Amino acid sequence: MFEPLRKFPDFSDEQAAAWEAIAARMASHGVELEAGATTPRTEHSGPGEVIAVTGKAGSGKTVLLARLATRLAEIGLAAVTGDYEPRRRTRRSFAILAPTNKAAGVLRGHGVPATTIHRIVYTPVYDPEYQKVADWLEGERKTRPQVEGMTEAALDRAEAFYKQHGSVPGALAAAGVRGADFITGWTRRDQPLDIALVDEASMIDEARLDDLREIFGLIVLFGDPAQLAPINSQGEMVFETLPEPRRHHLARIHRQAAGNPILDLAHALGDPGLDFAAFEEMVRAAARDDDRVRIASRADAELMCTSPILVWRNKTRTRLIKAFRQAHHIADDRLVRGEPLICDGLELP
């Protein structure tokens, strides 16, 4: 029996109301957040149900999402991630999703096992030989597998890595198996899942939402109505088309209460009556009042070591990167400590 839910004293009234509304909808799908109980899945007929939590940056959407994810795991639901899925799934399931890998990475930074929508809509096809190793690591296979080309030492490395990190692709990489050998292709998912918590929902169009509704019985969208709508959405975000009872808005800005000039400026950009000159004056005023806002007439190579510089054109980006490397006497073909590296995530743990 799982522990009953302890209320969160740090929730605002809006967050608590949104939690209660989400908990009620999850209960109708057989997942009891309060009691910590689940009932067996029943096949849902028709598209999945959709509800939404909206609010600007700093309103507490991510905190609410993270608490929901933690609670779902506590009561025994299996988190479906972009890492690996066993072929036989008996537990109720949930997934934390984002439209892009960058957005999913932000959630992972909060300790949330997030992955991309694409990674859930499409599932990998595994090589049958390496599937034996995956099943063994996951406990689905009792006997140690024998796979051509894999030594006992390689299996030992895979087992040790999996026990420490819980990642099947990482374990296979530790054994010397490349992702391109382990995953031989991709196919559209035909196995239903239970609950999706979707962050950055302002970036999702109707077609992508329809994909999710074919897979999940319940979809909870988290989105910022102050963001720009997707290009092909005719100016409307998917959560804006939901009836009022299915939308729960968080109006209070928690981070603003701590005094955040960057957040103040970001929210000001949502004012349709604000022109460029007025916004520029707001930046100057913020710089006068707060050391966290500085106005510089040029790009500082020292600051670039720790602070990103945002530019409008790719040509400007390339020019600044070249100037930065020259200022630090870095050759064009040399990687240095701390420099970002973009790679195929399947090849590395």
Task: Give residue ranges: language-model regions.
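Conserved helicase motor core of P-loop NTPases
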Residues: 44-47, 79, 210, 214, ...
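Pre-Walker A (Motif I) flank of P-loop NTPase domains
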Residues: 37, 41-51
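Conserved P-loop NTPase motor core of helicases/translocases
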Residues: 2, 17-21, 40, 54-59, ...
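Loop/turn-to-beta-strand initiation segments
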Residues: 192-195, 216-221
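N-terminal pre-P-loop "Q-motif" helix
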Residues: 8-40
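Hydrophobic positions on the alpha1 helix immediately C-terminal to the Walker A/P-loop
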Residues: 64, 68
